[in-house]
From Swiss-Prot:
GO terms for biological process: symbiont entry into host cell; viral penetration into host nucleus. Late in virus-infected cells, may be cleaved from a 56-kDa protein to a 53-kDa protein by a cellular caspase. This cleavage might be a marker for the onset of apoptosis in infected cells or have a specific function in virus host interaction. Pfam families: Flu_NP. It comes from the Viruses. This is Nucleoprotein. Homomultimerizes to form the nucleocapsid. May bind host exportin-1/XPO1. Binds to viral genomic RNA. Protein-RNA contacts are mediated by a combination of electrostatic interactions between positively charged residues and the phosphate backbone and planar interactions between aromatic side chains and bases. One of its GO terms (molecular function) is structural molecule activity. Keywords: Capsid protein, Helical capsid protein, Host nucleus, Host-virus interaction, Ribonucleoprotein, RNA-binding, Viral nucleoprotein, Viral penetration into host nucleus, Virion, Virus entry into host cell. A motif (Bipartite nuclear localization signal) lies at residues 198-216. The lineage of its organism: Viruses, Riboviria, Orthornavirae, Negarnaviricota, Polyploviricotina. One of its GO terms (cellular component) is ribonucleoprotein complex. Residues 1-21 are annotated as: Disordered. It is found in: Virion; Host nucleus. Residues 8-21 have a biased composition (Basic and acidic residues).
């Protein structure tokens, strides 16, 4: 792995922490959750929301968005320098849903960004509490990953839509810091780098001058983040090549796409954390729970326990299935969009279906949708078992996979074999081993060829009963191998649009 000296747990990244012991980490993550919860309670008071309205996930998303927008300094600066008609750069807002005379009504609210920043800081003991902001960004990113398949974005950068399991975090904003970088998939990093290289090809001055120096260091930093996700020497050596290139161009794009493809079998390390909507933290804090005192972890039992005891509601469109909406949000809560569905079904205790079989659209409601026919229902976010989240890709092996998604990116550290469609993946690697990286390419292909179906990942790791807080009795799950393993199977999920 990365040199042990520089590695920090993602709880440390999450809290910008220096080296801390487990108790300190749990306390600082708890403090972050407390801050989000207190902010949410205050916003519900400002907006005069009832308890039910405050537990509506659509209201939660609007409130989270408002605070993220209030702290988006780069965009705020841009809006002030490029005033556009009908947009007040100093204000932020969105739709808030209220129950009036037995009907759901949409109300557009507008607040001064300065006021929102004041409320946020007050809830966070006067700090900017960047970690809490990033936490909400990751929750939005996980929800996007579960709701949309990034087919168009993949095709535009010359990648294959079947590589969607590599795209975790593809909608995270650039300002999401170290915690954001930790949860980005290999494909996401590759896509960001390819976009950068393409700009350099089209714009002569992109790498030049004072700005070019900044661009270059950003490029090298992104290469290093991607390199740190790879687990084999050959993949890392390839990233060194890409990073050191004097004038990045098509050869580097080729190498990047090659390395992304290879990650379908030789998976990278991608962190997973359960980031819940603010409307879960708010009521918990309101009930008197002290997250900082009790301690909290994003990768252990805590989010599962919290969801066992939370009531969250969602607006439901006329032909949507509330159970399907619940599955969508449950997967997002556990950062499990690219996990094997058979394992998810086991942990959740109810069948988890591929995206294309779900009768549900995204959680957000567009401004032109008719509110008269909107109902609301409870989201079922409880689970049968819990499992430890992983930041490793697991070791590699093969099994029948699907026409849509041809690999998985594990979210839980649980013993199983990881499905991928070897013949489909290997077909992309015919004879393309020329050029500077030929020896690395040959080595990577050799390792991929050698990946065996029998190999088990996360050996000895199991799921745990919810009563087993100390994780003492692992239950190693058994799977029905006849079921489909991929979520975006031959898929028709909507496309993500900014």
């Amino acid at each position: 792995m990365a040199s042990q000296g520089t590695k920090r747990s993602y709880e440390q990244m999450e809290t910008d922490g220096e080296r801390q012991n487990a108790t300190e980490i749990r306390a600082s993550v708890g403090k972050m959750i407390d801050g989000i919860g207190r902010f949410y309670i205050q916003m519900c008071t400002e907006l005069k929301l009832s308890d039910y309205e405050g537990r509506l996930i659509q209201n939660s998303l609007t409130i989270e968005r408002m605070v993220l927008s209030a702290f988006d300094e780069r965009r705020n600066r841009y809006l002030e320098e490029h005033p556009s008609a009908g947009k007040d750069p100093k204000k932020t807002g969105g739709p808030i849903y209220k129950r009036v005379d037995g009907k759901w009504m949409r109300e557009l609210v507008l607040y001064d960004k300065e006021e929102i920043r004041r409320i946020w800081r007050q809830a966070n003991n006067g700090d900017d509490a960047t970690a809490g902001l990033t936490h909400m960004m990751i929750w939005h990113s996980n929800l996007n990953d579960t709701t949309y398949q990034r087919t168009r974005a993949l095709v535009r950068t010359g990648m294959d839509p079947r590589m969607c399991s590599l795209m975790q975090g593809s909608t995270l904003p650039r300002r999401s810091g170290a915690a954001g970088a930790a949860v980005k998939g290999v494909g996401t990093m590759v896509m960001e780098l390819i976009r950068m290289i393409k700009r350099g090809i089209n714009d002569r001055n992109f790498w030049r001058g004072e700005n070019g120096r900044k661009t270059r260091s950003a490029y090298e930093r992104m290469c290093n983040i991607l390199k740190g996700k790879f687990q084999t020497a050959a993949q890392r050596a390839m990233m060194d090549q890409v990073r050191e290139s004097r004038n990045p161009g098509n050869a580097e794009i080729e190498d990047l796409i090659f390395s992304a493809r290879s990650a379908l079998i030789l998976r990278g390390s991608v962190a997973h954390k359960s980031c819940l909507p603010a409307c879960v933290y708010g009521p918990a804090v309101a009930s008197g729970y002290d997250f900082e005192k009790e301690g909290y972890s994003l990768v252990g039992i805590d989010p599962f326990k919290l969801l066992q005891n939370s009531q969250v509601y969602s607006l439901i469109r006329p032909n949507e299935n509330p159970a399907h909406k619940s599955q969508l949000v449950w997967m997002a809560c556990h950062s499990a969009a690219f996990e094997d569905l058979r394992l998810l079904s086991f942990i959740r205790g109810t069948k988890v279906s591929p995206r294309g079989k779900l009768s549900t659209r995204g959680v957000q409601i567009a401004s032109n949708e008719n509110m008269d026919t909107m109902e609301s229902s409870t989201l079922e976010l409880r689970s049968r078992y819990w499992a430890i989240r992983t930041r490793s890709g697991g070791n590699t092996n093969q099994q029948r996979a699907s026409a849509g998604q041809i690999s998985v990116q594990p979210a839980f550290s649980v013993q199983r074999n990881l499905p991928f469609d070897k013949s489909t993946i290997m077909a992309a690697f015919t004879g393309n081993t020329e050029g500077r990286t030929s020896d690395m390419r040959a080595e990577i292909i050799r390792m991929m060829e050698g990946a065996k179906p029998e190999e088990v990942s996360f050996r000895g790791r199991g799921v745990f009963e919810l009563s087993d807080e100390k994780a003492t009795n692992p239950v190693v799950p058994s799977f029905d191998m006849s079921n489909e393993g991929s979520y975006f199977f031959g898929d028709n999920a909507e496309e993500y649009d900014n």
